[in-house]
């Protein structure tokens, strides 16, 4: 893969006549994860604004599946793929960015170090998990939900005069739907069948089977379960619990195909062991008017906040309650239209336009 050299990158910046302030968006890798997708959507909107020049920095080693998408948005000349901290430092020295924005768990980690700060006006941190980095001066901290901000202890107590003006919430921007079509014909699912769906990455450390166990209790000829990117453990559980109407969609980055998945299902049957901070997949379902069933996680409960009236969240391990809700959907004992509309209203709060403007305004506040 050809990448611009650090020397040519620095030269192109010094030769430019626009002299717009530079914002570098840093990820450890450009994976399929929600944090990287969030930044990818943001950048589509940021480049339409003429205030800043936007670059993307990331490590050469590791999973960089989204690299082509970022390259298409900002251009190959603004992709900083580095093999070592020294090489990134050299590039930062040449670019002298106005903002270096780190998207991470929020813990103290590279590139927020003094050597980088000497050549950078402002550090901004998106602390996905609410961790605090007090090792260096950070101008603004962004959280993906109020839940995470609360975990960080930075929500403030206005009635006591306690405020944290440099700590803000900007949720995952949702760009959807991409299609009005579905995958029922392709998957062999009748139009009148009731379909539950689950989407998530293949990661044994966060796998939870409450949804699989509950579905096994309600499955019948006209009820199906569609699983996107199921893990080996998930496939094993499908067989172990005797599920016959499971349909698989392999891992994909195709937004149109993912949109068709959401149009295929009636309810998103979510499960993740550690819970969610602010699930983009939930909001994508809401954008397609798909209600949600989920459960309390071991660590994060941000999905209670983001679900609102668009679904149900059961206690951790409560397969019986999860099953009861699934059955109520199938038997039309819940007001599906009301839940569907409530889900859509949740999505309306986090459209790509609204969230991109919110984050861009944080950058502009530092000018």
Residue positions per predicted region:
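Conserved donor-binding/catalytic core segment of Leloir-type glycosyltransferases
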Residues: 24-26, 190-206, 212-215, 226
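N-terminal strand-loop element at the rim of the active site
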Residues: 26-33, 37-87, 230-234
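Nucleotide-activated donor-binding/catalytic signature segment of Leloir-type glycosyltransferases, i.e.
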Residues: 74-78, 235-256
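Acidic donor-binding loop of glycosyltransferase active sites
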Residues: 260-277, 290
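Short hydrophobic beta-strand element within catalytic cores of glycosyltransferases
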Residues: 291-295
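Conserved acidic donor-binding segment of nucleotide-sugar-dependent glycosyltransferases
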Residues: 311-319, 328-334
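A short, well-ordered alpha-helix in the C-terminal region of glycosyltransferases
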Residues: 328, 335-349, 361
